[in-house]
């Protein structure tokens, strides 16, 4: 056989290593979430008088989670540079970013209110927030559904039975 990756019969092992790398470092850049959090903060500041105090907590949570995600990716990258590998913990990151993406876009739509659905006001880039919100539903599905990731976490990280 030509162009064989790994040994004979190791295809699943190679596929899982590739998927772990994809989930752990490649699929979603931390900068993407940091930029979205910054835009969300600006959206909040532009509409602060229309927002409830609870909305401020959502903005702080989005910012803190985007920074947490960046730190976890930096940790994973430094682990790899030191000769380590991406393990099953990449499943934690995949669930984290997919839920963070949805939460940030959902928060933006709450700030914009019903008018976001009725007009494409360029001042607030409502159309971009709506598009991002709709796309955020794909995150928990692609790169292995979040349900599958939870099973991986339970079995491989927590040692729970299948």
Predicted regions and their residues:
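Glycine-rich beta->alpha junctions and the first turn(s) of the following alpha-helix
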Residues: 1-69, 139, 155
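Short acidic (Asp/Glu) and glycine-rich catalytic loops that position anionic groups and cofactors
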Residues: 13-21, 37, 71-75, 79-86, ...
């Amino acid at each position: 056989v030509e162009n064989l990756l790994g040994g004979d019969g190791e295809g699943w092992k190679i596929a899982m290593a590739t998927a772990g790398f994809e989930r752990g470092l490649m699929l979603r850049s931390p900068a993407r979430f940091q930029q979205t959090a910054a835009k969300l903060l600006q959206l909040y500041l532009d509409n602060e008088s229309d927002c409830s105090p609870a909305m401020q907590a959502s903005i702080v949570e989005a910012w803190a989670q985007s920074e947490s995600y960046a730190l976890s990716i930096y940790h994973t990258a430094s682990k790899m540079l030191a000769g380590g590998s991406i393990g099953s913990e990449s499943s934690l990151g995949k669930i984290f970013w997919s839920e963070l993406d949805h939460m940030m876009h959902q928060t933006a739509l709450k700030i914009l209110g019903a008018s976001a659905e009725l007009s494409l006001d360029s001042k607030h880039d409502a159309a971009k927030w709506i598009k991002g919100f709709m796309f955020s539903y794909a995150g928990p599905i692609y790169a292995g559904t979040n349900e599958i990731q939870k099973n991986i976490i339970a079995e491989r990280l927590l040692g729970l039975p299948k």
